[in-house]
Structures are given as C-alpha cells and as structure tokens.
Amino acid sequence: MAGADELVQKLDVVLTVFGSRQGASPLKGREKEGGKEMQNLHAHSVFCDGKSTPEEMIRACLAAGMDSAGISIHSPLPFANGWAAKAENVAPFLAEMRRLKAAYAGRIAVYAGVEWDVLSDTKWLEPFDYAIGSAHFLPVGGDPAAYPTVDDSPETTCRFLAEAFDGDSDAAAECYFAQLRRVADAPRAQVVGHFDLLTKFDEKERFFDETSPRYRAAALNAMDALVSAGKVFEVNTGAISRGWRTTPYPSRWILEQLRRRNARVTISSDSHHAATVDCAFDDAQRLLEACGFEEIWAFDGRAFVKRRIKE
C-alpha cells in the first residue's frame, strides 16, 4: 500500500503522463452493426456540463441508428459545484425535452432523465422518465463543498488519497462504495452509474489495487445490495471517449461477478458531446458477450425490457 508521501511524489509523474490527455479529441462513435437496436440513456447537454444541446444529441443518436435515446441532466447539489445543474435549469430542461419528444415522434423515442448523485435531494428523482444513481464524492471533512470528487483528475486523486486517507487506497474505496450503495435505497433510481468510477485514471497510474481483499469486499458488498434492489448496471464508455481508458466501466472482473448474480446491464456512453453518443458501443457489447451476457436491458418509457445482444 502506497504511503502518503509516495502518493504526493507521484503527482508530477501523473501530470507528465496525463497532461496531454486532457485536451484529447473525443473518439467518434461507431456505426450500428447489423441493424441492431441501440439506446443511450446517459448523455449530458448544455443544461448541465455538456457541450451540445439536447437536440444536437438526439440528432446524433438518430445518425448512429438508435431507436431511442435519453438525455440526462446532473441533479442539483446542495453546495456550489461546477458540473451539477442549477435548480433553475431543471424546468427549462424538462420543457425542452417535451418539445423534442413531440418533434421527433415516429423517428426516435426521446426520454428525459437525471443522473442523481447520492448527495442530492431525493426530490430531484421525481420529475423525470428515468434516473441514473451515481456517487461522485467522498464525504471526508466537515464541509460538503470541499468533498473530493473521485473522477476529477489524477492529481486530485493523488491529493485526496494522501490527505484524506493517509495513502490507504482501500479505505478510499470503502468510502466510495459505501456511498454508491446508497443508490439501493432510492427506488426511483433504476440504473447504477459507472459502478467503479474511482478507477477512471488507473490504466496509466494505478491508484487502486482491485485485487485487494478489502477493495473487493467493498465492491461486492455494494454490488449485492444494488442487485438485491433490482438495479440495472450500466456499462459506461465515457472514460474511453475522454481518452483516460481503453475499456468501459466497470472492470471485467466486476462484470463477471454481475453475470454470476444474473444482474441486469445496459450500455451507455456518458456522453457530453454529440460526437460521442455511441462511443465504443460495439466494444462494450463484445465485452459483455465475453463475460457470458446474452441480454442487455433498455428503457421503453415505462420500464426496462430485455433485448438480445445477438440478433
């Protein structure tokens, strides 16, 4: 286990390795193969921290061959934050989504969603067609506005491991998965977002030991609670389009554990730009097949229904 001093010393190396990645161009999504049905529910627009309008995102989903698509706004938080939606943006977002549902009826099914953070008020689960439940923060220290974000940057990860956990990455993982487990207590949150988000930067600079018994116990305890609550787990390609990873969340061993539990899964891009709405969907599908999955689950406007991976 790396100590605090060692983690701090890693910072310059991390910045050197990742520095050019921050401005990397998004990977372009692949075209749909073989006429298969596709859906993306995790996509952010200019109503929170996205770069494209909802209509631009919907048009991109149409161009990618999708039969349905959801645009998800980040839930407002009870403290200042740079990426969450402001409370006053929710009503205009819902109004725009109603307009798009009508405008694109018969061409693509359009859904209004929310990515609900476990630190947000549960009222933000109510006015949407569906909800993705996620954990982004580690509740350490007394001021929620100063809670570290697990997916901010490699240097932030170095700092919170050193300063908040004295270099104990397993303790940080236990804290994260305890937060994510709270999604099980939110019935309106049907989907679990990026299950192991804290591993975002681990391909080039390993911060977390996923083989550690403590790490695995924390992850599996959260998984069991979420599976028991009937949640759908997303296979999220967002870190691929941002240049941080070459494989989706969650890690393969987690997918294998989900398969053993007969968990439901869906594929999503966590896109923040119209160019990435279907990034690496084919790769995610092949990974699921390799892990033994035969079905993915798609939202039909009322509930999640099965779709065969192989047509």
Which residues make up each language-model segment?
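Hydrophobic residues within beta-strands of alpha/beta enzymes
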Residues: A69-I71, A131, V192, F233, ...
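Extreme N-terminal basic, low-complexity initiation segments
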Residues: M1-V13
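An N-terminally biased module of ancient metal coordination in phosphate/nucleic-acid-related enzymes
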Residues: L11-V13, E33-V118, T199-R214, N262, ...
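Charged helix-capping and loop-helix junction motifs
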Residues: E210-A218, T247-E256, D282-D283
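Conserved, mostly hydrophobic/aromatic
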Residues: H42, C61, A131, H194, ...
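Mid-to-C-terminal alpha-helical segments outside catalytic/metal-binding sites
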Residues: T276-E311
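Extended substrate/RNA-proximal surfaces in nucleic-acid metabolism proteins
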Residues: W83, N89-S228
